[in-house]
A protein has these predicted regions:
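Extracytoplasmic gate region of multi-pass secondary transporters
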Residues: 12-16, 197-255
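Conserved MFS/SLC helix-loop-helix module at the cytosolic interface between two early adjacent transmembrane helices
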Residues: 43-81, 262, 268
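Symmetry-related core transmembrane helices of the 12-TM Major Facilitator Superfamily/SLC fold
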Residues: 149-165, 359-377
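Interfacial helix-cap and linker-helix signal at transmembrane-aqueous boundaries
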Residues: 19-20, 51-52, 134-143, 230-231, ...
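Intracellular juxtamembrane helix-capping segments at the cytosolic ends
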Residues: 19, 97-110, 307-320
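C-terminal transmembrane helical hairpin of 12-TM major facilitator-type secondary transporters
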Residues: 219, 239, 245-315
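Helix-loop-helix hairpin linking two adjacent transmembrane segments in secondary transporters
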Residues: 120, 125-172
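Hydrophobic core of transmembrane alpha-helices in multi-pass small-molecule transporters
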Residues: 3, 71, 82-97, 213, ...
């Protein structure tokens, strides 16, 4: 499910060129669809977590999977910006919203080595980013962009609906880790930690929200604009699309390496390393013009992306416990979605105004380094 949800989402940058060529839209306007998507996605993450608690993840995620497939089906019929914003900005966002319930299931099933378990689940995200964008680019060259979206819709619908039927919550107790985790009843584990009201009063909650904001601002700005930026530097479209594949492949490695570092040392250390690497990679891409320099950037950026992505769920469990895990994580994602929404628009506006992405990349680098500073301020408090 992670492969299809995030692989198709990160393919939007591949369709950027066809949209601009066919309709003559500016980059800022086209980016607005991604902005609306991430805003609605962030809002719905909070509600999907609550609905999953009440109705169960299988029902909620099945319905969302159907809506996701319909969203991509309707994308093949886009003729105006209103269509683009409705189908991609609303329908696809609704279909993506079970992301938080999926991560909360992992946090509750596994009581130890959460970083490693999260890495395994989220590796599907990196796999999707690695495989789907170049496949989408190949489809566009073969059958044009409208038919490509039809293929994506059918495949996404079949895989996500089928996979959602296997989801379930632990009925009595969390899975015992191979290392020998404590055998605590599920009901007890569910009530560990701070309530949502208690959590929002802490400094750590504010830091979590800023970490999410800076992370998603940088991430979505890059995934939306990096392909069209590379093409603008005379890198062939097929090779430019590979930058997303390098991000996806390195993302898988980053998830597993940083997940293990978090389990062995702490989420704080792993998060600091990830933000440092992301900031440095964004500085590197500013003067880059060659294919190899873009691939090197994509590898470093993707590794950092994977590290951050895998750490937020166990970080919430470490800082606040699992009592309100889904709602706290969903609220952080909601704040982060603001960054994800305005990031691509700001980057597109900067390019439309100046003809260059330089200022956009500098802004992303600054935000990444502020994320590093914020991660160093995190402190674990007693869960009472």
């Amino acid at each position: 499910m992670m492969t299809m949800i995030w692989g198709t989402f990160n393919s939007f940058g591949v369709f950027f060129g066809p949209f601009i060529r066919e309709f003559g839209w500016t980059r800022a306007i086209t980016s607005g669809a991604s902005a609306l998507n991430t805003m609605i996605f962030g809002i719905l993450c909070v509600f999907s977590a609550g609905l999953s608690e009440r109705l169960g993840p299988r029902r909620v995620i099945t319905v969302c999977s159907i809506i996701l497939g319909l969203g991509y089906f309707f994308m093949a019929r886009v003729t105006t910006t209103s269509d683009l914003y409705l189908y991609y900005g609303v329908f696809v966002a609704i279909g993506m919203s079970p992301y938080i319930p999926l991560l909360s299931l992992v946090a509750r099933w596994f009581t130890t080595n959460r970083g490693r378990m999260n890495a395994i689940v989220l590796s599907g995200m990196g796999l999707g980013i690695m495989l789907v964008p170049p496949m989408a680019n190949q489809l566009i060259s073969m059958v044009q962009w409208r038919n490509s979206y039809l293929v994506i819709a059918i495949v996404t619908l079949m895989i996500t609906v089928a996979a959602s039927q296997f989801l379930k919550v632990p009925s009595h107790q969390a899975l015992e880790d191979r290392d020998g985790g404590p055998d605590t009843p599920w009901a007890d584990r569910r009530n560990e930690g701070l309530s949502f009201r208690q959590a929002v009063r802490t400094r750590e909650f504010a830091l979590l929200c800023w970490l999410y904001f800076s992370f998603l601002f940088c991430l979505v700005s890059i995934t939306v604009h990096i392909v069209i930026h590379a093409i603008g530097l005379d890198i062939p479209a097929t090779h430019a699309a590979l930058t997303l594949s390098f991000i996806g492949g390195a993302c898988i490695l980053g998830m597993n390496v940083m997940g293990n570092i978090a389990d062995r040392f702490s989420n704080k250390i792993a998060l600091g390393v990830s933000y440092s690497l992301m900031g440095c990679s964004l500085v590197w891409v500013i003067p880059s013009h060659s294919e190899w320099s873009f691939y090197l950037f994509s590898t470093a950026f993707g590794f950092a992306y994977g590290g951050m992505q895998v750490l937020f769920s166990p970080l919430v469990a470490e800082l606040f416990g699992t009592r309100a895990h889904g709602v706290i994580l969903g609220t952080g994602a909601l704040v982060g979605s603001i960054g994800a929404a305005i990031g691509p628009i700001i980057a597109g506006y900067i390019f439309d105004a100046s003809g260059s992405y330089t200022l956009a990349f500098i802004l992303c680098a600054v935000l990444a380094f502020t994320g590093l500073a914020s991660s160093l301020l995190l402190q674990r408090r007693p869960l009472s």
